[in-house]
């Protein structure tokens, strides 16, 4: 329901989802990912985990910026694209922090009463 949409609440949830998804992916935690991703995104994450394309030596450090970039309504689905700027470090060495920028799209049916959104694009 868009009438009650609160962008701050949405961004707070997106931040938590971002951190959870990054950490779950890096740890190969497919069960957590399954509940946070659309089917297609889950398949690509699952494939990367299975093919050991993940790089667990990088760990999430902090999220510095999250900003709504775009909102699209398509076929009764609302899609919100968020820009994240995060920092990650290598091999438990916080002196090796790298900055990463990501655009992620979250979606859910407009009429859904479920407060949760699914990651549909990275």
Task: For each feature predicted by the language model, list its residue ranges.
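Intrinsically disordered, low-complexity boundary segments flanking structured domains
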Residues: 48-55, 68-70, 105-108
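Surface-exposed, charged secondary-structure patches
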Residues: 54-92
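Core segments of small alpha/beta cavity-forming domains
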Residues: 1-60
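Phosphate-binding glycine-rich loops and adjacent basic patches that engage nucleotide phosphates
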Residues: 4-11, 66-70, 97
């Amino acid at each position: 329901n868009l009438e009650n949409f609160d962008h701050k609440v949405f961004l707070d949830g997106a931040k938590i989802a971002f951190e959870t998804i990054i950490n779950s992916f890096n740890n190969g935690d497919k069960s957590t990912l399954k509940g946070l991703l659309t089917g297609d995104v889950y398949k690509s994450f699952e494939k990367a985990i299975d093919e050991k394309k993940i790089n667990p030596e990088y760990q999430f450090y902090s999220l510095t910026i999250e900003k709504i970039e775009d909102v699209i309504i398509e076929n009764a689905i609302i899609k919100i694209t968020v820009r994240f700027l995060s920092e990650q470090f290598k091999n438990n060495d916080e002196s090796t922090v790298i900055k990463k920028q990501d655009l992620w799209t979250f979606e859910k049916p407009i009429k859904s009463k479920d407060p949760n959104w699914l990651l549909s694009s990275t």
